[in-house]
């Protein structure tokens, strides 16, 4: 979120009252099914539900507009609603987050608004019972799976890497390695050893890591065959869905056993389960060394899926986001190993600084596109699972309308800043405020659907 907020740090300061479409407060109904409104009869019928996870702050307000103005007037769908706003997570002792993940397991598709992960300041601000864990982490721990980030490309938004003319999707194995490691400071000379004690009672194995002649640091880390296998299945499934080649990067020349295990598991699963489908789609899987892969990515035009270990994915996903231009144009989809269950959301946070301006009654210029794409990616997947071609076409049409709207020159301040520089842009000359931009997308969508 910090990167996104830096991009959009300069807000529209024009005076004005709260936009008419914006809810007056953060609170919302917590029931799983919200009251049905009266919409046109010619909506696309959707047979099975989608789980909706509401969120916090500015993204929550935009989320409501997207649902009421862009989705529900055209799609007749049952939404299993869960309020993951921080006040309700606190009120339910975070049970609502667990319930939303279990519902996603049941219905296979979820769309999620950005949420606050509380720190000490948020605990004080919201008078929370405790510092609740990241809802994304809780959901991921229940569902498993891999988070794939993919940029939304608009031709008129400059890229730091101009050659990236097609998207690059990065899949991060968000389990183990450095993030679950045990590290320590050795404050004197001594021997650092690793010991493995098998549960079956067989012989203990011991490795001497280093003999410290003086102070230093040490670390032990791990991963599991089960987690690596789930990661591999998610990556292969996603590549087949996108019809893009898949690259997996490690440093197995140095970590021969550790990274070599990643390489071997991926290859075994590919050969056994996915090679036929890859050949059928004329795509390929390839393992590469991480340093070679980074160089190849910079030279490439895009159009592939990149599977990264935990640390590599953490670093490289931020590089990709900046290289493509903006976190406001980055989607995030959690894909489970079954290839059927997904949860889609925006890659950015709740846009707190804009929400503070909104609370003062001032208009903002907040980019809603990644939140719109959370809805479209979820609906498109629902359509694929159900064989609902009308729903798939609608989701693709809404995405196309968003991109074409930006390419026509109508955009929010963060995107205008990418083109002209934030210090040079002016309201209604280079960018629109939030409500006007959303209204423009709505008008363009209505026009596009009317042409069908």
Curated annotation (Swiss-Prot):
Instruction: Report the outcome of residue 172 to G.
Output: In GLM; somatic mutation; reduces enzymatic activity
Q: Using the UniProt record, name the top-level EC class of this enzyme in a single word.
A: oxidoreductase
Which is one Pfam family of this protein?
Iso_dh
Upon changing residue 172 to W, the result is: Found in patients with cartilagenous tumors
What PROSITE patterns does the database record attribute to this sequence?
IDH_IMDH
The feature of type site (Critical for catalysis) is located at: 179, 251
Q: Which cofactor does it need?
A: Mg(2+); Mn(2+)
Q: What is its EC number?
A: 1.1.1.42
Task: Name the NCBIfam families for this protein.
Answer: nadp_idh_euk, PRK08299.1
**Name of protein:** Isocitrate dehydrogenase [NADP], mitochondrial
Origin species, per record, is Homo sapiens (Human)
Gene name per UniProt? IDH2
